């Protein structure tokens, strides 16, 4: 049984764990260079983690684009924890975290085309044309709030 815990990164150690996951997923698995992955925007972002017990297994960062628009970026889940709803747990908790602070907030992201259906399953819709980012096909997506 898994015990996933959501947390906003708040220490240097947690940030290092976030960076380690991004390095493993993006640099090692997807062959994106570290220079591209670590783009000097991290200091402008809020970083979030999912723990399984005491091990960090997923991460994402969130950056303000406009007054009420946040961009979810660098979503990464360790390989052995994919298909266990870790990614959706991470994204849903990020959205709830910021909506609790400002109910008028909107969310956008650039999804790799290969995983756009994952984001569609958690109420994101695509808009615009496909484009390449770091040599990988992407599509812009925005979150559609559901009425509660």
Please report, for each region that a protein language model flagged, where it lies by residue.
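Conserved beta-hairpin
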Residues: 34-60
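Conserved beta-strand in the GNAT
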Residues: 49, 55-64, 68-76
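A conserved beta-turn-beta hairpin within the catalytic core of GNAT-like acetyltransferases
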Residues: 64-72, 82, 101-105, 133-138
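Conserved GNAT acetyl-CoA-binding A-motif
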Residues: 91, 98-111
């Amino acid at each position: 049984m898994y015990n996933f815990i959501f947390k906003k990164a708040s220490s240097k150690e947690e940030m290092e764990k976030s960076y380690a996951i991004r390095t493993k997923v993006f640099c090692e698995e997807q062959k994106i260079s570290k220079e591209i992955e670590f783009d000097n925007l991290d200091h402008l972002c809020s970083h979030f983690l999912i723990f399984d017990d005491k091990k960090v297994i997923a991460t994402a960062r969130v950056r303000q684009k406009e007054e009420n628009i946040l961009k979810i970026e660098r979503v990464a889940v360790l390989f052995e924890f994919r298909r266990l709803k870790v990614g959706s747990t991470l994204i849903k908790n990020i959205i709830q975290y910021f909506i609790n602070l400002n109910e008028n907030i909107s969310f956008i992201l650039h999804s790799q085309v290969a995983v756009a259906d994952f984001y569609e399953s958690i109420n994101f819709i695509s808009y615009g044309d496909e484009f390449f980012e770091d040599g990988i096909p992407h599509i812009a997506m925005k979150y559609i709030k559901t009425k509660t």
